[in-house]
Amino acid sequence: MLSKILSSATYGIDAYLVEVETHVEKQIPGFIIVGLPDSAVKESRERVTAAIKNSGFEYPLKKITVNLAPADIKKEGSSFDLPIAIGLLTATGLIESNKLVDTVFLGELSLDGKLRPVKGALPITVEAKKKGIKRIILPVASSVEASIVDEIDVYGVTKLDEVVDFLNGTNELVPIKSDRREIFLRVNKYHLDFSDVKGQENVKRALEVAAAGAHNIIMIGPPGSGKTMLAKRLPTILPPLTFDEALETTKIHSIAGILSRDTALITERPFRSPHHTVSDAALVGGGSFPRPGEVSFAHHGVLFLDELPEFKKNVLEVLRQPLEDSRVTVSRSKLSLEFPANFMLAAAMNPCPCGYFTDPNKECTCTPPLIQKYMAKISGPLLDRIDIHIEVPAVKYKELATEAPAEKSGIIRDRVIKARDIQLNRFKEYKHIFNNADMGSKEVRKYCKLDTSGEELLKMAMTKLGLSARAYDRILKVSRTIADIDNSENVLPQHVSEAIQYRSLDRELWKH
């Protein structure tokens, strides 16, 4: 007897439907799975056999053939256990085939018939809805993320016999639903705040400008000056995630299996801070069957690289593509997958190996060649993609001891949102430009025009401060963002003057 049942698998951050065909015939007992299964799928035979027996159902001593279609795409993971078991029970007559119409099954079985959570429940549910599927049955531990998708019934189950009873009408299950409005009411309730940081007003201002224009930023300063503390609070001043952004971010975390079981939707901007020993595959994604990396986990959020020169050079170089394209392409011999990676880069570094090159209170013990070698670890092409460089001085005792309240993240965020709204309106006719950092040379010439005073100021700065040619466009972009924060239609000399301050690493001081 033959049964056909629907399941699904992930491909990149999306999913595709898989038809599980089960054929049972009177021949020498055996269990074969075809359709390019990986080792985890092949092992389903043992899990399904034990789960059926331990759930109290009769296991057929016949030849069983399972085909996973389409057969030309490799299937991986243990999520096919439940559909294979249901298909087998249907083929042997324990479940009526008409009960399986417009239903997707998903879940890993333990040997006693209980269901374990699976990766990718959210993108699979989204794909099922697109294809007109009416319901999805999956482990209760994976049902919370799936329940955010509307217009499809999501049933969370705990064991195999519960699914069989539900399909046969002897057990009632209630679809799980999540309230999007309730979830988004909790948005922006961060436990960190910029008001926690004493002093460093210039650095806070630079971070506000970076957030307002989506500019990448690097902070240079001695140990203990607060670089990491400031970077961790950067997401608190970014605009709230839209529903589409939250959905895309959650899908990435879902397929990687790092989404919390009680999280229906990620509503806070991600903040990822990989250690400097991270490999290039872990940073941008990789593996024999490609998986997303840290740059994708930081999608619509912040990627923070602390101690930037300590990262391996090849690791830093692979950052160039995602910084330029906001996407990562991972190619293998038989497939090529694309993962979104639209993040803000925030980096921090000491000015030299000992850390005290720019500290007026402590003597630097590094020789000039040592400092030059240390700085050379960051390539020009990577630095070229970072718009704002800001020096972070050591905090003075007077600032640490002050009782005066500092500005809260919410107030800064309101200014950032207003500046972003101006940019969205400015670039509404462009498909791939949403903020000032996205501008190319053509857009910079159009939207960042300077008056005579501004031109003279920039020319003098380029000459006297020894700024590089690549700093020119960066200064104009940042000037435009500062003007947007001030709600100024024109880029004024004071905006240019402030932007010039944010090119620390282009100065002659760092080149010798």
Give the location of each predicted region.
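Peripheral, non-AAA+ core regions of ATP-driven protein-machinery
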Residues: M1-I218, P222-S225, I266, S331, ...
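Walker A/P-loop
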Residues: M219-S260, D325
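Residues immediately C-terminal
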Residues: L111, L303-F304, E310-F311
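Basic, amphipathic alpha-helical bundle interface domains used for macromolecular binding and assembly
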Residues: V34, A40-R45, E58-P60, N67-G77, ...
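Walker B catalytic acidic pair
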Residues: H300, D306-E307, V318
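P-loop NTPase nucleotide-binding/switch module
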Residues: N171-V209, G213, P240-V295
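The Walker A (P-loop) glycine that initiates the GxxxxGKT/S ATP-binding motif of P-loop NTPases
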Residues: G221, G285, E307
